[in-house]
Amino acid sequence: PYPLYLTQLMGGTIIDEAYEKNFGQQNSRESILELQYDGSTTVNNTVNTYLSIYEGAAFKPKHMALDPQLISGYGSVNPIIGFGRTDLRMVETAYLQSPDIAKPLVKFTASTVSVNKPENMSDADAFINYSTRTATSNNAHWPVYRLADMMLIKAEAIARYNATLGDNADKNQLREGFKLVNQLFKRSNPALVGS
């Protein structure tokens, strides 16, 4: 019921179409407002300066890196303690193969992501493949608002409003809020729910 991009399972490998469309390509159907960069006249230097760059066949962290605590519980599936082992958002965010404790960020530097072991991306033999943008031609648009953001904002508003109603909470609204969040969870964890 929601016009979200989904992941594709091809021969045991997850092709993360949602990441590619939203962060690799520009102006996806899920995008509501994006800052535009063309990679030559306007380069996304925010990514190059603060997040990471890809040069010399490696992701190199800049001023920001992923807090190791977000991946300390990566072996489990418990969103309260950080990313779970089946959560595509982890490999969309950080370069797990880095030997550094604080992993370099890959979001906006990587243009595509694929994973051969989606049921446990924390395994040493899980192969995560990225297509990347170079520092000198980073054309990654910066999504300010996406459909996923609006879905989460709506679910949060439903939950907060109904919390004030106590026993009179609207069960239909609560179901709608749950469906919104669950749709995003299923997209990010295809190994748990199938494709």
Annotate each predicted stretch with a short phrase.
Residues 164-171:
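Intrinsically disordered, low-complexity Ser/Thr- and acidic-rich flexible linkers and loops
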